[in-house]
Amino acid sequence: LGLVGSEMCIRDRLGEQNVLCGGLVDLMKYGFETLTEAGYPPEMAYFECVHEAKLIVDLIYNGGIQKMNSVISNTAEFGEYYNGPQILPADVKERMKESLKRIESGKFAKDWLEEAAKGAPNLKAKREALGQHPVEIVGAKIRSLFERN
């Protein structure tokens, strides 16, 4: 895999910030918001846009994207090819390249160190706002239904 210290750190940051934690979380929130703003029940929106993500990730983890596509419905797969590029157009890749440059140049690290030195007020504010977002409130309610005593 060629895991060299600084390269691994850069890859990790890009993957986490742009794809896994940044991109995926925003996609789930936007999907949830789109459905609820259109009048769909929040619980159903949560299941469709957040809860089912684990199923898809598990399918990809165990067999790759093509294997996942062989398991999901033809309708879902067609939507992947038809709607996916409309939701995430190719210019997203250009923005990821810009983000990678900020990581590689040390700008991201500098910005984070400045934020941390101030007590991380922006991070704490974003964390607080997310905790009050309906997707988190509904998610807590849904997850509590699955808790085993």
Predicted regions and their residues:
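N-terminal charge/polar-biased segments
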Residues: 116-149
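Interdomain hinge/lid region at the active-site interface
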Residues: 37-38, 63-123
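Small-residue-rich helix-loop
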Residues: 42, 48-55, 63-64
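Single conserved hydrophobic/aromatic residue that forms the stacking wall/gate
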Residues: 1-10
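A short glycine-threonine-serine/GTX helix/turn-capping micro-motif
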Residues: 14-22
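Inter-helical turn/loop segments and adjacent helix faces that build the functional surface
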Residues: 34-44
